[in-house]
Amino acid sequence: MAKKKSNTEQPTREVVKPIEGEVICVVKKLFGGEHVQVICTDGKERLGRIPGKLKKKVWIREGDVVLAAPWDFQPNKCDIVYRYTESEVRRLVEDKVISQDVIEQLRG
């Protein structure tokens, strides 16, 4: 039987971009459980909560770039919506959603 040709090109997925009410943040510290401390691009430090649908599927470490949705009733807290991979962070920089300087400053 003939061997099938494999498609070496992987389809490029759309990068999740922040919509209204969401900010890009960098994880500063892990508190355990489902809580992290994040520094956001709007200049605020927030206590982030990792919801159950992400907790076991996506492992979040210090220095990761994440998308967060600040709470309306407590602006110093937020929910983590998405974790960006390094290639997705590069795509965000290429699309001028965020600058590389800002990410480096937030990572410390």
UniProtKB/Swiss-Prot annotation:
PROSITE patterns: IF1A, S1_IF1_TYPE. Gene3D superfamilies: Nucleic acid-binding proteins. Residues 11-85 form the S1-like domain. CDD domains: S1_IF1A. Belongs to the eIF-1A family. Seems to be required for maximal rate of protein biosynthesis. Enhances ribosome dissociation into subunits and stabilizes the binding of the initiator Met-tRNA(I) to 40 S ribosomal subunits. This is Translation initiation factor 1A. It comes from Sulfolobus acidocaldarius (strain ATCC 33909 / DSM 639 / JCM 8929 / NBRC 15157 / NCIMB 11770). The lineage of its organism: Archaea, Thermoproteota, Thermoprotei, Sulfolobales, Sulfolobaceae.
